[in-house]
C-alpha cells in the first residue's frame, strides 16, 4: 500500500470499469514515469471530453453537438432504429458496416438489484420517438446477458402498443453473458443481418 497522492491515483484509477488493483497500479506508475507533456496532454483531453461532449438530443449517443452526426446524416434510414444499451454499442454496430438506420441509446439495462428500472433508462424517449417519427422497425440490440435479455423483454412488451411496428432482435451467434462491444465485426454483422421478429 502506497501513501499520499500515489495511492490516491491508484484508488481513482481502480474505480474505472475493467481496471483492477494491479492494472490501476501499473497505470499509475506509467503516468509517474511519463514525460510531463504527456501527462498534461492526457489531462487536457480528459477536460475537453468532460466539458465538450454531450449526449445527442435525439438518440442519446455521445456528440460534440446537440444532435450527433448519425442523426444528422440524411443518408441514414430514419424509419429503422437500433436500440442499444450504451454509446460504445453504437460503435460496435457501426464497425459491422451492415446497419444504415439510426440508433437509440438507453443509457444502460434493467437491473433491479442495482436500482435500475425503466425510469432510469431512456425508454420514455424511445416510445415518444416511435409515436412521433415514422419508424417502421425497431431492432433490439441489447447485450446477450441477464440484464440485456430482461431489457429486451420489457421493450417488446412496451412496443406491442404500436400497431404495424416491426420489432426484431439480433440473431443468435452472440455469446450469452457477453457484451456487444466485444463481439467481432463478422459475428455482429451476421447477427444484425439475421435478426428475428419478437
UniProtKB/Swiss-Prot annotation:
It holds the Pfam family RecR_C. SMART domains: HhH1, TOPRIM. GO terms for molecular function: DNA binding; zinc ion binding. Residues 79-175 form the Toprim domain. Keywords: DNA damage, DNA recombination, DNA repair, Metal-binding, Zinc, Zinc-finger. May play a role in DNA repair. It seems to be involved in an RecBC-independent recombinational process of DNA repair. It may act with RecF and RecO. HAMAP family: RecR. This is Recombination protein RecR. The lineage of its organism: Bacteria, Bacillati, Actinomycetota, Actinomycetes, Pseudonocardiales.
Amino acid at each position: 500500500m502506497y501513501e499520499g497522492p500515489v495511492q490516491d491515483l491508484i484508488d481513482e484509477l481502480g474505480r474505472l470499469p475493467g481496471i483492477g488493483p494491479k492494472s490501476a497500479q501499473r497505470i499509475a506508475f506509467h503516468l509517474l514515469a511519463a514525460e510531463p507533456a504527456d501527462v498534461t496532454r492526457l489531462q487536457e483531453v480528459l477536460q475537453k471530453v468532460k466539458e465538450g461532449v454531450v449526449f445527442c438530443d435525439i438518440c442519446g449517443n455521445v456528440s460534440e453537438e446537440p444532435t450527433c452526426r448519425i442523426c444528422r446524416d440524411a443518408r441514414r434510414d430514419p424509419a429503422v432504429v437500433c436500440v442499444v444499451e450504451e454509446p460504445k454499442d453504437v460503435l460496435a454496430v457501426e464497425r459491422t458496416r451492415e446497419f444504415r438506420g439510426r440508433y437509440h441509446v438507453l443509457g444502460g439495462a434493467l437491473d433491479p438489484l442495482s436500482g435500475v428500472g425503466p425510469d432510469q433508462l431512456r425508454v420514455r424517449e424511445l416510445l415518444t420517438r416511435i409515436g412521433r417519427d415514422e419508424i417502421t422497425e425497431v431492432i433490439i440490440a441489447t447485450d446477450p446477458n441477464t440484464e440485456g435479455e430482461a431489457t429486451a423483454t420489457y421493450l417488446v412488451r412496451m412496443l406491442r402498443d404500436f400497431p404495424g411496428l416491426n420489432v426484431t432482435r439480433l440473431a443468435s451467434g452472440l455469446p450469452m453473458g457477453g457484451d456487444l462491444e466485444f463481439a467481432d465485426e463478422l459475428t455482429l454483422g451476421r447477427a444484425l443481418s439475421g435478426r428475428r421478429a419478437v
